[in-house]
Amino acid sequence: MATGAPGGNFRTWTPTPPERGSFPLDHDGECKEYMTKYLTCMKFTENKNAPNCRILAKQYLKCRMDNQLMEKSDWDSLGLVNLPGENDVELDHHHHLNNNNTKADGKSGSSNSNQNLANTTNNNTGTSSGTK
């Protein structure tokens, strides 16, 4: 691509690719659930880098890597290693969030996922659950 410059000088401009390659859009919505939960967490914590949001970010990136929507990368290079509370929430083979905090009867400890998000966020950021 050529660009015009004053005086009739033409220079060729060559675009440079992103450092980690291209990131295809998720047209089929394969990772939309993770993206939505991560963005909700970020909104709730006022865009602070809370540990529970980092866990959701890791799950979102794992989904993107598993579905070839981004290149596979090690967690250390992404800064997502040994996150606190990471073992409480895992990713199953069908890319759905599983909460390992279940009762003996197989039911979850809480029926409201937003309340779980709020409690986790408040525990990790030191705020009280009645504020906001």
From Swiss-Prot:
The residue ranges flagged as biased composition, category Low complexity, are 110-132
- Asked if the keyword Mitochondrion belongs to this entry, the reply reads yes
Task: Give the location of motif Cx9C motif 1 in residue numbers.
Answer: 31-41
Swiss-Prot/TrEMBL GO biological process terms? mitochondrial cytochrome c oxidase assembly
Q: Where is the CHCH domain?
A: 28-71
Query: Sorted alphabetically, which keywords does the UniProt record give?
Result: Cytoplasm, Disulfide bond, Mitochondrion
Question: InterPro entries, from UniProt?
Answer: COX19
- Identify the domain of life: Eukaryota
- Where's it found, cell-wise? Cytoplasm; Mitochondrion intermembrane space
Which Gene Ontology cellular-component terms appear in the entry? mitochondrial intermembrane space
Q: Which PROSITE patterns match?
A: CHCH
* Similarity-based family: Belongs to the COX19 family.
What is the stated purpose of this protein? Answer: Required for the assembly of mitochondrial cytochrome c oxidase.
Q: What is the protein named?
A: Cytochrome c oxidase assembly protein COX19
Which source organism does the UniProt entry give? Candida albicans (strain SC5314 / ATCC MYA-2876)
Report which gene this protein is encoded by. COX19
